[in-house]
């Protein structure tokens, strides 16, 4: 018999919940964001490569990396707090490591969920699984 304290906690927000929220959020459709997967304290979001998201040189524009990281972190937080508990970005630092010329995928993870402040990290990869950006994110729980 397994001790229930060693069992992973069930997320308070599911992939289906995230997809429903995405369908109801217009900016998500404009960006083309997709929910790839999520679990307790983490989420993975995809962003398809689209011409209107590129800069000269044919690489994804910098804010594209930040949008996918911000949304992935938003979902990661909701896996711990549920959808009714809002959290908004108060700080974000992104290191751009290489230009992406393909779809990108970001995995964000809650590092610390405080009573008011949430800290997290995110890593963004291109279609070849090369790390293209790393982000550090801070949110306030509203």
Feature roles, as predicted:
Residues 1-142:
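Terminal targeting signals and extreme-terminal segments of soluble enzymes
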């Amino acid at each position: 018999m397994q001790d229930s304290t060693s069992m992973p906690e069930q997320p308070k927000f599911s992939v289906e919940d995230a997809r429903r929220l995405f369908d109801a959020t217009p900016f998500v459709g404009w960006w083309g964001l997709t929910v790839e997967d999520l679990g307790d304290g983490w989420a993975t979001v995809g962003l398809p490569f689209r011409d209107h998201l590129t800069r000269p040189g044919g690489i994804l524009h910098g804010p594209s990396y930040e949008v996918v990281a911000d949304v992935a972190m938003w979902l990661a937080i909701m896996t711990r707090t549920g959808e009714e508990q809002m959290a908004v970005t108060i700080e974000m630092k992104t290191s751009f490591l290489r230009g992406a010329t393909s779809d990108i995928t970001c995995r964000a993870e809650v590092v610390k969920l405080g009573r008011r402040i949430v800290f997290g990290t995110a890593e963004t990869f291109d279609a070849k699984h090369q790390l293209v950006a790393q982000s550090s994110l801070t949110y306030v729980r509203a």
